[in-house]
């Protein structure tokens, strides 16, 4: 006669172990999903925070000239240009100017598409030192929209800005005598051509 096994039955324990492993895997998957979702949500929040506060050298957008006019104190503004992954030549028409704080000023960048086909780019920007981002106000800028250039096309791109007079009351910037405005154009792979803004399509106006 065959004898039945006398050892303990481990089947329930194995089932409990399998269920515990499944629960742990589910919790880990949920945590990963939440982390990915949070990272995507953090990007627009960070961009909004930078625009509102000027953090990390992010400039501000102004609707009009400041109240009260320009101050006697002047400041030098330097202009920097870069491209990343685009067959473009991109440079400011002047590398440095000195302006009264609060004075609305227009400068131009020149860009040329060296490729034999249409290309589209978007300009990222910041100012240095980073503490002046909240005071650098742009009224109009080519960085507000995508830029599409035809084969070998050259275009002049305006920037209309002023340095907020509130800078003069900021004790942290008492010794500040220069600001650098920097742009970098990046490619947009699948962007559709867009019509030029009215300020860019018309004849060049204004002077430094």
UniProtKB/Swiss-Prot annotation:
Ranges per topology, Cytoplasmic: 1-19
Answer yes or no on keyword Transmembrane.
Answer: yes
InterPro entries, A to Z: CtaG/Cox11_dom_sf, Cyt_c_oxidase_assmbl_CtaG
- Superkingdom classification of source: Bacteria
Gene Ontology molecular-function annotations: copper ion binding
Q: Give GO terms for biological process.
A: respiratory chain complex IV assembly
Cellular component terms per the entry's GO annotation = plasma membrane
Keywords from the UniProt entry: Cell inner membrane, Cell membrane, Copper, Membrane, Signal-anchor, Transmembrane, Transmembrane helix
Q: Give the UniProt subcellular location, in the record's own words.
A: Cell inner membrane
**Transmembrane segments in this chain: where?**
20-42
**What sections of the sequence does the record tag as coiled-coil?**
none
Q: Which residues lie on this side of the membrane: Periplasmic?
A: 43-208
Q: How does it sit in the membrane?
A: Single-pass type II membrane protein
Q: Does the keyword Ion transport apply?
A: no
What does the record give as the function of this protein?
Answer: Exerts its effect at some terminal stage of cytochrome c oxidase synthesis, probably by being involved in the insertion of the copper B into subunit I.
PANTHER family linked to this entry: CYTOCHROME C OXIDASE ASSEMBLY PROTEIN COX11, MITOCHONDRIAL-RELATED, CYTOCHROME C OXIDASE ASSEMBLY PROTEIN COX11-RELATED
Q: Which family does it belong to?
A: Belongs to the COX11/CtaG family.
Please identify the protein, giving its name as recorded. Answer: Cytochrome c oxidase assembly protein CtaG
Look up and give the organism this protein is from.
Rhodopseudomonas palustris (strain BisA53)
């Amino acid at each position: 006669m065959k004898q039945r096994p006398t050892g303990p039955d481990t089947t329930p324990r194995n089932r409990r172990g399998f269920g515990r492993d499944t629960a742990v895997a589910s919790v880990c998957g949920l945590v990963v999903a939440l982390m990915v979702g949070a990272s995507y949500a953090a990007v627009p929040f960070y961009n909004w925070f930078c625009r509102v506060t000027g953090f990390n050298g992010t400039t501000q957008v102004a609707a009009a000239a400041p109240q009260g006019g320009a101050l006697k104190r002047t400041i030098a503004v330097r202009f920097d240009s870069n491209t990343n992954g685009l067959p473009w030549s991109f440079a400011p028409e002047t590398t440095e100017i000195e302006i009264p704080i609060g004075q609305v000023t227009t400068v131009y960048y020149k860009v040329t598409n060296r490729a034999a086909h249409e290309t589209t780019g978007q300009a990222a920007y910041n100012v240095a030192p980073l503490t002046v981002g909240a005071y650098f106000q742009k009224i109009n800028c080519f960085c507000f929209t995508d830029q599409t250039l035809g084969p070998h096309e050259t275009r002049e791109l305006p920037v209309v800005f002023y340095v907020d007079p509130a800078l003069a009351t900021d004790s942290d910037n008492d010794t500040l005598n220069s600001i650098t405005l920097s742009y970098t154009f990046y490619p947009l792979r699948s962007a559709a051509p867009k019509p030029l803004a009215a300020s860019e399509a018309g004849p060049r106006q204004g002077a430094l």
